[in-house]
Amino acid sequence: MDISRAEQRILHLLAQGGRIDLVRDEAGKLTDAHCYSRDGWRYTGLDMALFRKLKRRRTIASERGQPYRITRRGLQLVRSQPDNC
């Protein structure tokens, strides 16, 4: 399965130890998703449409309320590259 360049960038960042944190409003509805590198830097290339696409393809998952991380399937799909360019 081919994945887009934007998906590739997010998965590569997650494969290096990054995470995706969800932002919810007062009613508990999902409003935004923030992607962080392992160093704590926020990556701005993640929007809700891309988050849903990654989740639907089962390349990311959350366990026990923790931030979203890359799955084994996501690791198989990601291609190696020296940086996130």
Swiss-Prot record:
HAMAP family: UPF0386. This is UPF0386 protein HNE_3437. Belongs to the UPF0386 family. Coiled coil: none annotated. Pfam families: YjhX_toxin.
